[in-house]
Amino acid sequence: MKKILILAMFVVVAVGLMSVAGAAEEKKALQLDGSTTVGPVGDAFAEAFIKEKGCSITVKKTGSGDGVAALIDGRCDIAMSSRYLKPEEYKRAVDANVFPVAHVIAMDGVCVIVHPSNPVKELTGAQVADIYMGKIKNWKELGGSDMPIVAISRDTSSGTYEVFHEKVLKKQNMDAAVEYVNANPQAHARVKSTAGAIAYVGLGFLDSNVKALKIDGIMPTRQTIAQGAYLVSRPLFLFTNGYPKLGSLTHAFCIFYLTEEGQSIVEAKGFVSLTSY
Amino acid sequence: MRLILRQFLDKAFTLAAAVSVLIIVGILLVVLVPMFQKGLSAVFFTETIEFRKLQKETHNRGNDEALQRRIEQTNAARKPIYDVLADFSLGINTESLVKEAKDIYQKYGEYLNYHNIPKDQYTEYRKQAKDIRDTMIAALESDNKDIVLANLDKVLAQEENPIYKDSPVQKLFILALQYQKTARTIDVAKRSEYLTNLQEVTTAIRQLFGPLPGEALPPLPMDQYGATRMDMAQKALHILLWDEAWVSDGDGKPLVKKNISRREQFAGTALEPLFDQVEKNIDVLLMPQFRCYWQYFIDDWVNSHYFGGVGPEILGTLMLTILAMVFAIPLGVISAAYLVEYAPDNHWIKLVRMCINTLAGVPSIVYGLFGLAFFVVTIHAIGKPCILAASLTLSILALPVIIRASEEAIRLVPQTYREASLALGAGKFRTLVNVVLPAAAPGILTGIILSLSRAAGETAPILFTGVVAMGPIPNFGSPSEWIRNPGSLFGGLLQPTRALSYGSYDIAVGDRISMLVPHQQFGMVMTLILLVLILNIAAIVIRSKMSKKLRGY
Amino acid sequence: MAENAAQTSVGQKKAAVGFSRSLLLTPSEDLVGFLSGHLGRAILFCITATSVAAVLLIFYFVIRESIPFFYTGTAASGIARVKEFFLDTGWYPSATVPRYGALALIVGSLYVTIGALVIAVPLGLLAGVYLSDIAPFSLRQICKPVIEILAAIPSVAYGFFAVMVLAPWLQTHLGFSTGTNAMNASLILAVMALPTIISVSEDAMSAIGREIREASYGLGATRAETMIKVVLPAAHSGILAAVLLGMMRAIGETMVVWMASGNASRIPSPWWDVSQSIRTMTATIAGDMGETPKNSEHYYALFTVGLTLLVFTFSLNLISEYLLSQIMRNKRGGK
């Protein structure tokens, strides 16, 4: 008798959980996969969409490469990427009958940041490359105080790392002593707490706790990034399989950045809207 | 060795052993206390009127009337502050004032046309207006206080002229008056500095009280409300009252931080009384009071965890673990029963035992890899990361724990029980089901609960097999749908879900916004720890009851 | 029924008390029962064998996905790959010419594990000694739940603690240039390995039995001497098993090292400098897996790292199994 009661209780709990979970009717669904940099914009767009249209949007932030792979495998509708497709990825996509179309929704600048107490105000691209390759080890060589440089980089699988690697380091390998962090907020936290640290983060992470350096004489601002004048500016992409069908949810999502609301979300998240120049 | 030395060593050893246990208890406290301290502030905190506004608008909680009254009170208290700010802003932003002057001049031309003034008078009036406009612009653009004031006086001298009555030019005189007020008090040359500082002050006011009246609604929910908690309000207040600058301490030395009081920055200007007003009246402006936000465990998050709670994550974790148990419990208990009761003592069984122990030792990330390679990639019926794949992976993780605990529990059942049952004529299977298993039930239950808590806390196996950072709560349809179409239940299992364990990781290293709300980060981790702790304490209680039952004391 | 007993058919045994049928039926009489009994046992064996199936499948899939990394055509390139994997310290999978040198990762895993054991083993053994021999029963009842709670805290909570609380503390109070380093990871791993070490070594010491202890006391030894010179050596196999199980736990831990170790793929130089960041195998798999496209070289390389991890923990498991069987023998009164 007691056993039957316990069993019945379990069944009721299970049914209850599931009906709490899915009491709604079938909604239109959208699946996004990809970069952790574009992720916050995707999140905010998704939230605005859910409020307006009542659809269901799933956002996975596992990395640019995985997002593109998911698009090729057909597991997602939109891939978010902070870099363009690599040639092998493009070839694999075409081989699988997927023809990726890029939508640029915002621009981002990779800013080199240091602790606010660091007297150094600007560096050249070559100097930054030397720091990350281990050739410059102390701030006094650059006109700062006598402190060892703690170089911090995003880990090798991130799109931000790839852009930095390509444009600043010119594809050379980093020094073995460089510390790797998983994501932008960690890099920001490390610089905030360590006086001798140098790192690179997206534009949206600049605040009063860190100081951005001028690179080659140009300060990363909305204008310089949108014009491409700043050394490490990059577009942020959404990739779809072919141009999305007009009027579909995917299409609405991909052109959302053109609306006023989309632009203000992009700016509020700390990125540069395309029309900033 | 001398006896005293040996006794001393003995005492020292005992002391060291006792100290080590104390250290371990200390470690537990050091780990748990900060988590709970900061995590509980997500549930118990001092809220402000902004929080109540948020709750009303997103979840429709709270008494409408009382809230309205309160909102009116705070608005009344805030109005003077907004007025001071608006006055000063109007007077400082010379670029927009120049634009307005030009606008007014154009409008005046239209006004004259509208009133059909004869042509020569028209040209005359327009020329005079142009003069006034140019003087005004000269006043706005000059850096020299004397020139500014002289030009403003010239403009304002024209105020009495009757031809300008009821015309748009009146507005120009109002602007001139306001700018005169500002120009008398500030150092005109440092206008741009005042402008930058004013922008920081305005941002701080927005952080405290929400968007300024008359501004468009910002797109992100986090900007649509002011400070919802008193601790965040205190931070914004600090930014309002103090500015910080990094000044040089000498060549080759790091810069040092200097705090500059904003009262000094704006000393003598119209903005100065604002700071005192805000600081002294903060209670009336925000109406703080204590709140127990227990809905934290039910609500969904708003704006990347800036507001809201962890409800769907808890639901996701529960779904994953319960489904994992559905797979693991039958397999585990039956395997344990077989191993104890039926298994012969040959090398096949030794192999099985060895495999079970191996399973217990596999690292959790390798489970994740296996789950990815097998459940997601190889089994095409599943094909993508989803609840089903993640639960299957978790069930394999939980299996060895259940088997071990059940085996021990079944072994502990005294042989006399079995002998008595057999003597009464029951077969071996009957004995197992009706006598042994119920007697071993507390131990088996303990094992189940322990594996449940392990499955709830694991992140690595579910990373690639079915968990997402943001997504809808999985839709299983309603019971009526299941009757019509049983396949829809399976469809529900093919969706990914959020989970507490992955959410804690994501929020710790993820969005920038999470860094602004540490109470949310700690709150999620605390929820996970609470869940696991409750399960474990239940297991401990059951086990102590069981030991009483089986031992008889 | 007694009347029926008197009328039993020829061939059936006569029971003392009459039953309607004999107690033990031959297969020919009760085919259904016979078959179902054996079928049932077979089914139960198969169900139990799912664990075996699971282990075999795990090994199969991990090996299957690692082979394409080594076998790219010729045996020579395969051997070169193996050499690069185990001897090269550069892990640059997304460079233009990718290098998959996992030496730094392997050394990193071992580094934090040994660091964790250095802290956890003395602490754990002392606590085990205290709980098995010195503590009164009531204190033991209190300490057991404490240790179980320590074991139950999820690893992501420990990782969170390491990043948010321990790392800033290390930076401010010990003056390290970075708070997420090998020392941070070792400390947390030690805390995670402690419960295993304490419980297994306590079991081993209790299994020794009272006789050895009483003999030692009878000869006039103090408690410390008994523990150090008699009990610990007698339980050495169990204690070694405890250490190995703790090591298995530490090496297999993912979330804590991913968040707290700094993820710098290099070998600390000088080797005793624990304030430098390192990267472990588990953190590499967890961190890189999200970015790698399926069935690319990087994907296979990550599975190879997983295979290394699996082989390592499996061998540790086998050794500790063997050692634990020794305490089984002790318990039953052997040796």
Describe the role of every protein-language-model region.
Chain A
Residues 8-16:
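Bacterial N-terminal signal peptides
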Residues 1-4:
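Positively charged n-region of N-terminal signal peptides that target proteins for export
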Residues 6-7, 22:
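Short amphipathic alpha-helical "recognition" segments used for binding
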Residues 20-277:
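Exported/periplasmic ABC-transporter solute-binding proteins
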